[in-house]
C-alpha cells in the first residue's frame, strides 16, 4: 500500500490509475497501479498493489516523505454521474482488480446507491478489502479453492442474483472480464 499526496489528486476519478516510476535506475518501465481511494480535501490517494517483481518490491521499501515520479491520473475512470439513491449497482472484482472498486463503492454509497459486491480470489490468503467494502453494502466472496467464502469464481454468485442492476462495474483478470461482458452483454451500463 502507498499513500501519495499532491495536486494531481484533485483531478482523480474512481477507476483511474497512475504510472509510477520505480525510484532506481535499473527499472525503466513505469508501473501502472490503480487508485483505490481518493481524499481530495487532504490531496491524498491510496494505492494498493501486489508485489510481483523487483520494481513493486522497491515500492514496498519506501517511507513516509519519500518522493515518487508519478504520471496521471490515467484512464477514463467510471462514469457514476447519474446514479442516486434510487439506483442499485453491482460491483465485481477479481484479485488485484478489487482495489479500484473501493473508491467506486465509497462514492456511490455517499449518494445512497444500494451496492452488491462480488469478489473473486484464488484462495483465502489472497482475499483483500472485504471488510472495507462491506461498509458500503452486501459483499460476497468466492475463492477458486473454496478455502474462504463460496467455492468457485464470481459467476457462481452472479448467476444466482435475482436483482436488476442499474449499472455494473468490474475490474479483474481477462477471464472474469470476458464472463462479465458475456453475462451483461445487453446491459446499457455494464
Outline where the language-model segments fall.
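Ferredoxin-reductase
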Residues: 1-66
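FNR/FR-type flavoprotein reductase catalytic core
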Residues: 54-190
